[in-house]
UniProtKB/Swiss-Prot annotation:
UniProt source species: Mus musculus
Catalytic activity field: Preferential cleavage: Phe-|-Xaa > Tyr-|-Xaa > Trp-|-Xaa > Leu-|-Xaa
Principal location class: secreted
Sequence similarity: Belongs to the peptidase S1 family. Granzyme subfamily.
UniProt protein name: Chymase
Any GO molecular function: serine-type endopeptidase activity
Length: 247
């Protein structure tokens, strides 16, 4: 199966590594998603990469484990990531907490917490996002929204502005072609009959259901055809709570 994790490599050659964006969605109203974080990553190979994430505490961002790097800078308060505004806050990451069972080959347990060196200042442009409760098993059929700075089309350059797209939770059978899909710890999201999906650059962004973060964008088929796989946040609340409590 040709899986494609959704982070964005900026300096590699080849079409499979170009920047990406939400497909079939719309531009967010500026600063209507004040918890969104744009992650500027220097990889272990010294490439520049990018992901999405979201602020859950003044000093913690939640994202995907495959967005880990040698160093990460977090941009908060952004709508257009290329046009500086007074709302911007740029903060360095002090420590990256990858889930201890994360497997980069199977792309399971794809979740990471980032502790910031300084606490973010909560403003109209910067805020936190509530998480799904412990073991709150959200059922298939719910309509949710994915948010990120990924591609708007497979062959298009990355979006400068924050995008969002409506995506419906699917039965686990819809993701059976992903051999490592695990229903208890992952969500199968997106109608296979509609070209509305996350793509490169959206990794680590939230899946919002009734204003609550239920998932984290993880991977999709290389051709961008839905459904996509999101990490199921409720499954990891005990681990998240432990990291927050101890740090």
């Amino acid at each position: 199966m040709h899986l494609l994790t959704l982070h964005l490599l900026l300096l590699l050659l080849g079409s499979s590594t170009k920047a990406g964006e939400i497909i079939g969605g719309t531009e967010c109203i500026p600063h209507s998603r004040p918890y969104m974080a744009y992650l500027e990553i220097v990889t272990s190979e010294n490439y520049l990469s990018a992901c999405s994430g979201f602020l859950i505490r003044r000093n913690f961002v939640l994202t995907a484990a495959h967005c880990a790097g040698r160093s990460i800078t977090v941009l908060l308060g952004a709508h257009n990531k290329t046009s500086k505004e007074d709302t911007w806050q740029k903060l360095e990451v002090e420590k990256q907490f990858l889930h201890p069972k994360y497997d980069e080959n199977l792309v399971v347990h794809d979740i990471m917490l980032l502790k910031l060196k300084e606490k973010a200042k909560l403003t109209l442009g910067v805020g936190t996002l509530p998480l799904s409760a412990n073991f709150n098993f959200i059922p298939p059929g719910r309509m949710c929204r994915a948010v990120g700075w990924g591609r708007t089309n497979v062959n298009e350059p990355a979006s400068d502005t924050l995008q969002e797209v409506k995506m419906r939770l699917q039965e686990p059978q819809a993701c059976k072609h992903f051999t490592s899909f695990r229903h208890n710890s992952q969500l199968c999201v997106g109608n296979p009959k509609k070209m509305q999906n996350v793509y490169k650059g959206d990794s680590g962004g939230p899946l919002l259901c009734a204003g609550i973060a239920q998932g984290i964008a993880s991977y999709v088929h290389r051709n961008a055809k839905p459904p996509a796989v999101f990490t199921r946040i409720s499954h990891y609340r005990p681990w998240i709570n432990k990291i927050l409590r101890e740090n």
